[in-house]
Amino acid sequence: MASLSGPISPTNLEMFKPGVEELNPSKLLLLSNHQEGMLYPTILGSLELLSFKRERSLNLQRDKVCLLHQESQLLKLRGTGTDTTDVPLKQPMATSVNCYHDGIFTILEQDRMPKTSMAPTLTESTGSLVTRLMSIPRLTFSIGTQVAMRLFRLGFRLARYSLRVTILKAQEGLLLIPDLLHAHPVEPLVQDRAVEPILAIEPLPLV
């Protein structure tokens, strides 16, 4: 006691009494923590003050980590055309390791953008197109040959008349092809070939 400087008041003497008697709830004091600005209930003669203060300071640090993480996410997405509205979620967020597990969290929920299909458009290759164009005349000639054979069986004069009309229509089409190419452009396969117009139509021999 002699080492203490200054007069000793009765209130100071009561603080050094051994805690033998039962603790009275009326002796509950509120000590202010000037560092964090919080009020912590403590009991004189108890060692729970340090653990209580440590737990509250740890929880306060967790709150600060949560707020800093959310603000950093909003700053990253600012100016990118993303909605920065905080939407409350019922479930804890994935990055809530340093936050309370029994609190209410808000996390930025981005709008789901429609997924664009990057699959290439299926187009017909040039080889298959040429093959199909070459197969059309063969099919037409085969059908015409079958029709001509049936006409020959029915009568010679009818077959000759039908063949004459078909050949005249074909020659007329050959004359009109150059004009049609300028009005209606078609595939390069047809344009590369120079089509010479037929100047005179030779008369068909009558048998």
Swiss-Prot record:
Which subcellular locations apply to this protein? Virion
What Pfam families would the database entry show? Corona_I
Gene Ontology CC? virion component
What domain of life does the UniProt record list for this protein's source? Answer: Viruses
Methyltransferase is among the record's keywords: no
Q: Which UniProt keywords apply?
A: Virion
Q: Which InterPro entries match?
A: Corona_nucI (IPR004876), N2-like_embe-CoV (IPR044311)
Miscellaneous information on this protein: The gene encoding this protein is included within the N gene (alternative ORF).
* Family in the record: Belongs to the coronavirus I protein family.
Biological role stated in the UniProt entry: Structural protein that is not essential for the viral replication either in tissue culture or in its natural host.
UniProt name for this protein: Protein I
Q: Which organism is it from?
A: Bovine coronavirus (strain 98TXSF-110-ENT)
Q: What is the lineage of its organism?
A: Viruses, Riboviria, Orthornavirae, Pisuviricota, Pisoniviricetes
